Curated annotation (Swiss-Prot):
The keyword Lyase applies. Keywords: Amino-acid biosynthesis, Aromatic amino acid biosynthesis, Lyase. PANTHER family: CATABOLIC 3-DEHYDROQUINASE. This is 3-dehydroquinate dehydratase. It comes from Desulfitobacterium hafniense (strain Y51). Its EC number is 4.2.1.10. It holds the Pfam family DHquinase_II. It catalyses: 3-dehydroquinate = 3-dehydroshikimate + H2O. Catalyzes a trans-dehydration via an enolate intermediate. The active site is at 23 (proton acceptor), 99 (proton donor). The record marks 18 as: Transition state stabilizer.
Length: 145
């Protein structure tokens, strides 16, 4: 059975104090703890990481196995990182892109995702619930294999 990876991109370490009107007051630790608890309860291995360095994120993606599942919030890399997109394509694992805020209702430059076309889905605008819903899907997908 594969592992679920949850990768958080740049500035997400500041959740809870960074623009709470857009991202809410829930901290990254609170989100991660909910995800860890849910996955452990289901008996599915999970690894959760956050980085502000694009190369580090890409290395984690490269280390994924063929039976793994990726939940990723690429942060600002969503809009321009073809390197992250290519990394996801190269490992060919099912991927869901998540965002706390509704990127389609924000500034024009945020409405474009270069990551979404290589994902099986995108969930945005539901705060921390975006991650929880993505995890529900990943758990179902892994237990049906």
């Amino acid at each position: 059975m594969g592992k679920i990876w949850v990768l958080h991109g740049p500035n997400l370490n500041l959740l809870g104090r960074r623009e709470p009107d857009k991202y809410g007051t829930q901290t990254l630790d609170e989100i991660n703890n909910e995800l860890l608890h849910k996955a452990h309860t289901a008996g599915i291995p999970i690894q959760v990481e956050q980085t502000n360095f694009e190369g580090e994120l890409i290395q984690w993606i490269h280390s994924m196995g063929p039976d793994d599942f990726l939940i990723i919030n690429p942060g600002a890399w969503t809009h321009y990182s073809y390197a992250v997109r290519d990394a996801i394509t190269s490992v060919q694992v099912p991927t869901i892109e998540v965002h706390l805020s509704n990127i389609h209702a924000r500034e024009e430059f945020r409405k474009t995702s270069v990551i979404a076309p290589v994902c099986c889905g995108q969930i945005s605008g539901l705060g921390g619930k975006s991650y929880s819903l993505a995890l529900d899907y990943a758990l179902e997908a892994l237990t049906q294999k």
